[in-house]
Amino acid sequence: NNKKPYFVGLAGGQGTGKTTTSSIVKIILEKYFKLKVFKISIDDFYKTRKERLNLSKKVHPMLMTRGVPGTHNAQMMLNFFKKAKSKNFKKIELPNFNKAVDDRSPKKNWYKIKEKPDVIIFEGWCVGAKAEMNKTLKKSINSLEKVNDQKLIWRKYVNQELKTKYKKLYSQLNCMIYLKAKNFSLLQKWRL
């Protein structure tokens, strides 16, 4: 099968149902359309705890906390996209991040894709996010940034990652789905 997989980006705030939606879409596409579907979260591509510790020392302490662009292994994601599109598809092994230990699972627990998927669902809160214009980065936007990022080093680093590595990655998505909550208080309620 020389046909390239169709990449679906699925984003939304925490608690909007990204994982549930991607699971349902996967079931429908497999059962009713007989397609091979693989779904993975951007969370599985977080840098290891050690890599984030080094990043937090080198760039900014807030980068120890996983979540924002720059805390994922962008090269690993790009390699995955490239391998999945390859005419000579070979088995792909992808990381599985264990949030309970805040680190990548051992390789024996990684995802294994043995056949080329028809559809790949790539989900996460920041999937498809775009960089801000530099003029919007001139001041902190919340109390966390005001206290911990007064010189905007963290904010500018995250934005630069979006502008470069993540832009290259997201440009390869064939379509984007964004799940939007009616308001922020609903997200808080759904997370409880």
What are these regions (language model features)?
Residues 119, 125-192:
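Conserved NTP phosphate-binding and transfer environment spanning the P-loop NTPase/kinase superfamily
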Residues 17:
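Conserved glycine(s) of the Walker
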Residues 27-38:
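Post-Walker A helix-loop "phosphate-sensing" segment adjacent to the P-loop in P-loop NTPases
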Residues 1-9, 13:
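Extreme N-terminal, non-catalytic leader segments
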Residues 20-21, 25:
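Hydrophobic positions on the alpha1 helix immediately C-terminal to the Walker A/P-loop
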Residues 27-28, 56-58, 137-140:
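Glycine-rich, phosphate-binding/catalytic loops in enzymes
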Residues 38-41, 45-102:
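Conserved nucleotide-sensing/catalytic segment adjacent to the nucleotide-binding pocket
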